[in-house]
Amino acid sequence: MTIEDIGLVGINVRMWRHLAVLYPTPGSSWRKFAFVLPVTAMNLMQFVYLLRMWGDLPAFILNMFFFSAIFNALMRTWLVIIKRRQFEEFLGQLATLFHSILDSTDEWGRGILRRAEREARNLAILNLSASFLDIVGALVSPLFREERAHPFGLALPGVSMTSSPVYEVIYLAQLPTPLLLSMMYMPFVSLFAGLAIFGKAMLQILVHRLGQIGGEEQSEEERFQRLASCIAYHTQVMRYVWQLNKLVANIVAVEAIIFGSIICSLLFCLNIITSPTQVISIVMYILTMLYVLFTYYNRANEICLENNRVAEAVYNVPWYEAGTRFRKTLLIFLMQTQHPMEIRVGNVYPMTLAMFQSLLNASYSYFTMLRGVTGK
């Protein structure tokens, strides 16, 4: 079974392998540049367009959203390309842990693994479908405007983008963007969610194994061996979460700033525009940002919650039936489980639902302050 056959990450890794973002070969390495460079050029032209739209605040904010979203997608993709070896090594570690559970005699653990695979696969399909439809909506929205406009505003010095045939050529060039941007934007979100779901599943399996320790039918040595196995497994899970945090800590910190600023700006834009089409578009964009943020923080929060259940399971092990060696080892293990197992934003703040709420509160606070200053 290859990494693409593991449902937790298979869809996303398969796309990235095809595009040579991960696991490139000498014959396919050019694909990542053919994938990323046109979008990079489009993002630069969006920036030029933003400079021209400085005086029109609603149009500026809307195009700033598109610029930031595509810049964020590029940032994620370049991160994976630059850290390709680290991502490939981490996925190799995931495959090893996955197969160790799949090949074990623990039927309950295999059931947890199958449910985790199904959940991650369904989430990846949902994310790609929603992103594709979202961008299709942005693609057709200019058709309902009175003036000529492109789905993603672009500009070049000395070129009129609204005169024929430049307008038609640019519009046709943007037709592949639903597929292109969906494959660039959502795989990272789905991969993060799949990796976090696997971390949660491993902790659930550990809780179950701890619950199997004890009982009159188990000898002292058997109990100790089961406990030692759980400690070794917990150490593996800790290493897995630590390496996941090392890979994503900085990117999620940058995204927290970008998403918070975008939500604040879109709320302000919603307060000053009158076009029903633009209102619907902005509400859709805000919901998209909230969904991506919630996916990040909810999945990371589940690891924290499950780690707390591990500590409870250790505490509930019937230590009073065992000898001194078992009790001392269990006490040390209990102290180890008190160490927080979490993904941190910029290695500073834990990714929890409380942090998600704090980001929303900060965005809304800046929005009300901006509205008060402008009197809108």
UniProtKB/Swiss-Prot annotation:
Spans traversing the lipid bilayer: 33-53, 59-79, 124-144, 179-199, 248-268, 277-297, 343-363
InterPro entries: 7tm6_olfct_rcpt
One annotated GO biological process: sensory perception of smell
Sequence ranges on the Extracellular membrane side: 54-58, 145-178, 269-276, 364-376
GO CC terms: dendrite membrane; membrane; plasma membrane
Topological region Cytoplasmic: 1-32, 80-123, 200-247, 298-342
Pfam families membership: 7tm_6
Membrane topology reported for the UniProt record: Multi-pass membrane protein
Tissue: Expressed with Orco in 20 sensory neurons on the distal edge of the antenna.
Molecular function GO labels: ionotropic olfactory receptor activity; odorant binding; olfactory receptor activity
Keywords of this entry: Cell membrane, Membrane, Olfaction, Receptor, Sensory transduction, Transducer, Transmembrane, Transmembrane helix
Compartment(s) of residence: Cell membrane
Record family assignment: Belongs to the insect chemoreceptor superfamily. Heteromeric odorant receptor channel (TC 1.A.69) family. Or30a subfamily.
Other comment: The atypical heteromeric and topological design of the odorant receptors appears to be an insect-specific solution for odor recognition, making the OR/Orco complex an attractive target for the development of highly selective insect repellents to disrupt olfactory-mediated host-seeking behaviors of insect disease vectors. Odor-evoked OR currents are independent of known G-protein-coupled second messenger pathways.
Reported function: Odorant receptor which mediates acceptance or avoidance behavior, depending on its substrates. The odorant receptor repertoire encodes a large collection of odor stimuli that vary widely in identity, intensity, and duration. Complexes with Orco to form odorant-sensing units, providing sensitive and prolonged odorant signaling and calcium permeability. They are necessary and sufficient to promote functional reconstitution of odor-evoked signaling in sensory neurons that normally respond only to carbon dioxide.
Subunit structure, as described in the record: Interacts with Orco. Complexes exist early in the endomembrane system in olfactory sensory neurons (OSNs), coupling these complexes to the conserved ciliary trafficking pathway.
Protein's UniProt name: Odorant receptor 43a
Organism from which the protein derives: Drosophila melanogaster
Gene name as annotated: Or43a
